[in-house]
From Swiss-Prot:
SUPFAM superfamilies named among the record's database cross-references: PLP-dependent transferases
Modified positions (N6-(pyridoxal phosphate)lysine) in chain numbering: 279
Example of a GO biological process term: L-arginine biosynthetic process
Alphabetical list of InterPro entries matching this protein: AcOrn/SuccOrn_fam (IPR004636), Aminotrans_3 (IPR005814), Aminotrans_3_PPA_site (IPR049704), Class-III_PLP-dep_AT (IPR050103), PyrdxlP-dep_Trfase (IPR015424), PyrdxlP-dep_Trfase_major (IPR015421), PyrdxlP-dep_Trfase_small (IPR015422)
Reactions listed under catalytic activity: N(2)-acetyl-L-ornithine + 2-oxoglutarate = N-acetyl-L-glutamate 5-semialdehyde + L-glutamate
Protein name (Swiss-Prot/TrEMBL): Acetylornithine aminotransferase, mitochondrial
GO MF terms held by the record: identical protein binding; N2-acetyl-L-ornithine:2-oxoglutarate 5-aminotransferase activity; pyridoxal phosphate binding
Any one Pfam family match given in the protein's UniProt record, by short name: Aminotran_3
Native source species: Candida glabrata (strain ATCC 2001 / BCRC 20586 / JCM 3761 / NBRC 0622 / NRRL Y-65 / CBS 138)
Similarity section: Belongs to the class-III pyridoxal-phosphate-dependent aminotransferase family.
Pathway in which the depicted protein is active: Amino-acid biosynthesis; L-arginine biosynthesis; N(2)-acetyl-L-ornithine from L-glutamate: step 4/4
Keyword Chaperone: no
GO cellular component terms, A-Z: mitochondrial matrix
Length: 427
């Protein structure tokens, strides 16, 4: 609809954009967005603003979504082809695309070292929906054992979504407080506490706890990988007390770490009872999945949960392709290789500013650079120079580019980020 604003004059286009964003905005005020930027198209790891005739290297990938790049031609072809066949028929009936995707999720997960007892899949539309399903399934399992077994353990610095259940297990009070009372019986623990303290809490409350939800790599909290020994110990104590373990892999899963799932790097003893996926699963098309083992599935009955759009043929067709591409060892190896390139560049920048940068952490193509002060000015300067990055937590800049990003684009983006850091710190 905005084509009518484009002209051969850059000034005219910029004036048109200002009019759109300042005078013609019909969206609620829930987002803080720059008023001088409007994305009009993308190509793999780059985005373009045709209003301002600007090109950006994108190290955000739509917040770890477009794993196979913007405007992926094969994804576009699949969407177009499937749209001419069947878009939606609801979960009243089976569809081939849904059946294929469910099988592929289970088989690929097992093949690439993920949840060894993965059994069934619930398909929905977004990460928060996938986590809602996981929480409901855990509570249902708990209640079948003991009517009082309804509580959920979550962790400080967690982020699991913005719908009421997922919001209830999200740590940051700025997201929770404005909405009053949320889902009860949620306890937040500190993953950095001694294991003995965490175990004591669980042992004391074991008859009241249905599930535990955790991100193997905390994303919004600042890109913090959870130590393997902590995840092993958590699963052990939870299994002993019949508590369902949920891994939120919405941001860190699907090849992001160089493994198909972040938990694929863990021993089987630390595998979850449930894990969730979204974001990259549709490469930008809304689709998500909640994967459960047989123990969880046995607690469920027809009608316990549902969704109108979840598992629609359009989304499933795309996701089948995404899994085919990412669920390939050569592709995963390429992510690891690109991740090493990104890591090397970020560590070099840290070495130049030891008094300003306190840490570089992550794996594959999910990295966080922690500054000693809030990095908002650096993010803004990077954008001015042609690089899009985002924050995670209060002091960390997050790097989650498309998994298909070219090596030379990684290098170019690092050069821009280095200049942004130098420009800000030289003031």
């Amino acid at each position: 609809m905005y084509k009518r604003y484009f002209s051969t004059s850059l000034k005219t286009n910029q004036q048109a954009l200002k009019k759109i964003l300042e005078e013609k905005t019909y969206q609620v005020t829930t987002y803080a967005r720059p008023s001088d930027l409007c994305i009009t198209r993308g190509l793999n790891a780059k985005l373009f603003d045709d209003f301002n005739n600007k090109e950006y290297i994108d190290f955000t990938a739509g917040i770890a979504v477009t794993a196979l790049g913007h405007a992926n031609p094969k994804v576009a072809e699949i969407l177009q082809t499937q749209a001419t066949k069947l878009v939606h028929s609801s979960n009243l009936y089976f569809t081939k695309e849904c059946l294929d995707l469910s099988e592929k999720l289970i088989e690929k997960t097992k093949k690439f070292g993920g949840q060894h007892d993965a059994s069934k899949v619930f398909l929905c539309n977004s990460g928060t929906e996938a986590n809602e399903a996981a929480l409901k399934f855990a509570k249902k399992h708990g209640i079948t054992k003991n009517p009082k077994k309804q509580g959920i353990i979550a962790f400080e610095n967690s982020f699991h979504g913005r719908t009421m259940g997922a919001l209830s297990v999200t740590w940051n009070k700025k997201y929770r407080t404005p909405f009053g009372d949320l889902v009860p019986h949620v306890s937040f623990l500190n993953i950095n506490d001694e294991l003995s303290k965490i175990k004591d809490f669980i042992n004391t409350k074991k008859d009241e706890i249905a599930g535990l939800i955790i991100e193997p790599i905390q994303g919004e909290g600042g890109i913090f990988p959870i130590p393997i020994e902590k995840l092993v110990a958590l699963k052990e104590i939870c299994q002993k007390n019949d508590i369902i373990v949920i891994y939120d892999e919405i941001q860190c899963g699907l090849g992001r770490t160089g493994n198909l799932w972040a938990h694929a790097a863990l021993p089987k003893a630390a595998h979850p009872d449930i894990f969730t996926s979204a974001k990259a699963l549709g490469n930008g098309f809304p689709i998500a999945a909640t994967v459960v083992n047989e123990k969880v599935n046995n607690a469920l009955q027809v009608g316990d949960h549902g969704t109108t759009y979840g598992g629609n043929p359009l989304g499933c067709a795309v996701s089948n392709y995404v899994l085919d591409v990412i669920g390939d060892q050569a592709f995963l190896d390429s992510v690891t290789k690109k991740g090493e390139l990104l890591k090397k560049g970020l560590l070099k920048i840290k070495e130049q500013h030891p008094d300003k940068i306190s840490d570089v952490r992550g794996s594959g193509l999910i990295w966080g650079v922690e500054f000693k002060d809030a990095p908002g000015a650096i993010v803004q300067k990077a954008r001015e120079l042609g690089l899009l990055v985002i924050t995670a937590g209060k002091t960390t800049v997050r790097f989650v580019p498309s998994l298909t990003i070219e090596d030379e684009v990684v290098e170019e983006g690092l050069t821009i980020f280095n200049k942004a850091v130098n420009d800000v710190f030289s003031k």
